[in-house]
Amino acid sequence: MAGAAHDGPPDQVDGLDVVVIEKDGDTLLRVVGEVDSYTAPLLRRRLLQQVERDAGEVVVDLTDTTLIDSTGLGVLVSAAARLHERRGRLMVVCPSPFLREVFALSGVDQLVHVVGATGDGG
């Protein structure tokens, strides 16, 4: 990625890649694959590393995420709470209508800022 301060190597377990991209002081975690009880610890570790380093805005991009279960939702809620304590914010980019419905039905969209695409702002 041109102009990126740091493109972290993909951290991977079977079924999930999490790539951390830092650019112009912002942090983006690109999540590719399925987030479930097996893969959620990877997301938790990478996300909390960023939360501890950056009390600003952390963006989690779920564009290439095909599934997220309650374990994955819990990881996002926990990270959002941690960032809130530090006066930061977690934003989740989730263009998939199916995944947005999961966020809405679970009530997680009331706890985590979810947008449909990166241009939706907030």
PLM regions with names:
Residues M1-T66, S78-G122:
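STAS-like cytosolic regulatory interaction modules
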